[in-house]
Amino acid sequence: MKKLVLLSTMLLMFSFKSVAQDVTPQLTAFPEFRPAIAYMADGKKLEIPMANIFLKNSSLLYISGELTKEANTKSLLRVDFKDRTYFRIDSVLAYQVDTVGANALFCAKVLDLKAYRQLIANNSNITNLDINDLASMNILQYTTIDINDMKDIHFPVIPLYYYRLDNQFVLVHERNLKRVLNKEKRRRMESVMNLPDFSWTNEKSLLKILEVIQ
């Protein structure tokens, strides 16, 4: 079993299951590290035997010797895994959910740091001194720990959605979209938003918007 460099304290051995949002028992997109090909901003292509996506900030992790390291996202264009490709969008790596014509929907899953800190602050077993370290995210500094030891930890995660519109990436948010869409496309978007089952976190809803603003 590969060791994942993750936590500097075991004070987080409590569950996030009670939170009414998506949670994950792991801090990586995949349960195990796997081969990947990284396409760099300088034109180079690197084959990485053991790689993963770190949910703290949706960045690339790779194993080098006995260490797990985090790549500089700015140096990447995309990362190809066997069944999923991640593209650099802003400061995160996001995978393609689906396409609609020439446009597409992308998603990056990251830790919900606000909910994470609040749950830490509400835990009566953690002292004020511990809270300062945990809330500052020092617990996510690297120290070797076996993934199997993390079964009882559940981390809150949130999806960040992006549209690729006319070869430009836009963070999916009503305000952002209204800035880039013309009056007619804004009207079409609002018609979808008024549907009873619409949600900004529902991929079917977001793809429906992408369809009507073509």
PLM region spans:
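Bacterial Sec-dependent N-terminal signal peptides
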Residues: M1-P25, I209
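A broad, structure-centric signal for solvent-exposed, well-ordered loop/edge residues
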Residues: L7-S8, K45, R179
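Short, extreme N-terminal leader segments that mark the start of a protein/domain
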Residues: A20-L76
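Aromatic-patch recognition
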Residues: A51-V172
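A short, solvent-exposed beta-edge/loop patch
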Residues: D146-L210, Q214
